């Protein structure tokens, strides 16, 4: 019973950290990354469709993304959607390929992005702690039902705390990595 609670908590904590990593991967750094355009939606026959489903996106070099649209008639719509996004990018069309050069980040913009990433990290930590609280509540319910003793209750709460500390440490290391990436010129 307690092992099930611990395993469930670990799975949920891992999902919290993975969600955090997914969020920060979309934060623009100085490097070109196809995931940068993940949030862009194109109006395709009346439906908003993710750009990734309508085009092939590759990092041509460290500062340029190349987008090859599957349907040539969509190229102008893709350009407009990229310009309309809040990413501050200016795509240029060259035949069938749309190139998106990434301008270098200013110091002020880097600091703003670090604040955003830190806020995301705090949200991730809160999520992990909420999972810990839920797991501890389940263990306390078992104690209240007299399914387990106080020693086992204390031991399992310590295990859950160690698990929480380990996942928060992983989250913090991902944060430090992203901060270093953002400050890299």
From Swiss-Prot:
It is found in: Cytoplasm. The keyword Cytoplasm applies. GO terms for molecular function: ribosomal large subunit binding. GO terms for biological process: cytoplasmic translational termination. CDD domains: RRF (cd00520). It holds the Pfam family RRF. InterPro entries: Ribosome_recyc_fac (IPR002661), Ribosome_recyc_fac_dom (IPR023584), RRF_sf (IPR036191). This is Ribosome-recycling factor. The keyword ATP-binding does not apply. Keywords: Cytoplasm, Protein biosynthesis. GO terms for cellular component: cytosol. It comes from Sodalis glossinidius (strain morsitans). Its main location: cytoplasm. Responsible for the release of ribosomes from messenger RNA at the termination of protein biosynthesis. May increase the efficiency of translation by recycling ribosomes from one round of translation to another.
């Amino acid at each position: 019973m307690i092992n099930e609670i611990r395993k469930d908590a670990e799975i949920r904590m891992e999902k919290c950290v993975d969600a955090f990593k997914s969020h920060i991967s979309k934060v623009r750094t100085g490097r070109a990354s196809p995931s940068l355009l993940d949030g862009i939606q194109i109006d395709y026959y009346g439906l908003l469709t993710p750009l990734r489903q309508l085009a092939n996106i590759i990092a041509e070099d460290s500062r340029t993304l190349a987008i090859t649209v599957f349907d040539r008639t969509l190229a102008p719509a893709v350009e407009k959607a990229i310009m309309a996004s809040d990413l501050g990018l200016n795509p240029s069309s060259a035949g069938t390929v749309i190139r998106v050069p990434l301008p270098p980040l200013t110091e002020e913009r880097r600091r703003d992005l670090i604040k955003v990433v830190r806020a995301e990290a705090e949200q991730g930590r809160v999520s992990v702690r909420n999972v810990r609280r839920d797991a501890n509540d389940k263990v306390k319910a078992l104690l209240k039902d007299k399914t387990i003793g106080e020693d086992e209750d204390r031991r399992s709460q310590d295990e859950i705390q160690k698990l929480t500390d380990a996942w928060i440490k992983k989250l913090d290391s991902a944060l430090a990595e992203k901060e270093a990436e953002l400050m890299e010129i």
